Amino acid sequence: MANRKHVSTLLRNIYNLGRDVNAKFNQVWIYAGAMVIVTVPVLAWLTIVLSIDEPFCQNLLVYYGLNLIHVSEGQNCNFMRFLLIFIQFPVISMNTATAVLYVLLCCFSRNILKEYLSNGEKVSPLDCRSFKRYLIFYEQIFEVLSSLEASLSFPILLTVSNNCAFIFYCFMALDPFGKSPWPLAEHFYNFTTLTFLISLLSFLCVTLAASSVGDETKNAKQIQEKLLQRVLASTRKPDRDELMVLFVTHKRPAFTLTAWGFFTFTKGLILPAIGSISTFSLLILQIDSK
């Protein structure tokens, strides 16, 4: 409940900051995100229920029901279709909703930073007072990003970890090089392929969206330094010391989003992560094939 309040406050703060800098929030992104949250679990469910037959459903029912659930003959698939809704939907829906929410918040924050940079190039007249307002507004952005980190860094860690685990499992199950001694059952081929693509896209979208926020904060620091040089050049010498104190007082480092502090989201994370998963999967397949 507390985390829900934090997210609500975060959404309100992002909206207010966007309004202050005239940042545009495309509502199409919100509608598209809502469609993704609904569509992904439904597709995952359909890829299984449309490809299973009665004997396979009976085996699944024994597995999930611990041999304690018995239904009349010919009704195993109908019961499993109903049961899979409660098995699949909570996990897939939660992971998808977390990833979509995180990506949207990162994109909105990036848009705010872009408008902040654009406004910095148009500051006029450029004096100590306007420069101070510019620095104070960045502090507000910094606080919102800190709130984003505090509220969603742990959920996004679980989501990204889940994505990596699914990529690893699906890569081994699909066995693109024919190394596995236990080929994937044909009933799960469509589901495994879909899960692999969804997990990969989720990992890429989360990483790229989060890293774009860090890139914009680095650009913001460069703009602030350029503005400082311009203000110093047009300021009388007695006021320069006060200006430097102002800059140091309101100075904030570039902000990098993390997954609960375990790793930072940068574009350089993508290739090592995917390469490590692929290498380890091939190693396991090679060992199993011997």
Predicted regions and their residues:
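Inner-leaflet juxtamembrane helices
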Residues: 1-15, 102-113, 199-227
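Membrane-proximal N-terminal segments immediately preceding the first transmembrane helix
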Residues: 7-22, 62-75, 133-143, 243-258
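Helix-loop-helix junctions within predominantly alpha-helical proteins
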Residues: 17-98, 114-133, 170-200, 287-290
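Terminal membrane-anchoring module of integral membrane proteins
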Residues: 36-37, 128-290
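Hydrophobic alpha-helical membrane-embedded or membrane-associated segments
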Residues: 99, 103, 158-161
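Short, Φ-rich (hydrophobic/aromatic) sequence segments
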Residues: 112-116, 244-247
